[in-house]
Amino acid sequence: MEDEIELKTAPADFRFPTTNQTRHCFTRYIEFHRCTTAKGEESNDCERFAKYYRALCPGEWVDKWNEQRESGTFPGPL
């Protein structure tokens, strides 16, 4: 008997009713980093936000945002 893998993505969010999920992606990225700032890098509470932004955001965007955060030029409110 094989183990079944259950695939999940970010749940629907009433703040983002349209099919364009760019803003949803950016918001989840910011929520994750705000959570880790408030609760620490190892907080399990923040892991859901990480799963959401990883499911919604293209990897290139995340890489760029991470570089911007490190250099202090990230445009969002963290």
Curated annotation (Swiss-Prot):
Pfam families xref list: COX6B
InterPro entries: COX6B-like, CX6/COA6-like_sf, Cyt_c_oxidase_su6B
Protein name as it appears in the record: Cytochrome c oxidase subunit 6b-2
Native source species: Arabidopsis thaliana (Mouse-ear cress)
Gene behind the chain: COX6B-2
Gene3D superfamilies listed in its UniProt record: Cytochrome c oxidase, subunit VIb
One GO location term (cellular component): respiratory chain complex IV
Main location: mitochondrion
Domain (CHCH): residue spans on this chain: 22-65
Tissue localization of expression: Specifically expressed in roots.
Subcellular location: Mitochondrion
The entry's keywords: Disulfide bond, Mitochondrion
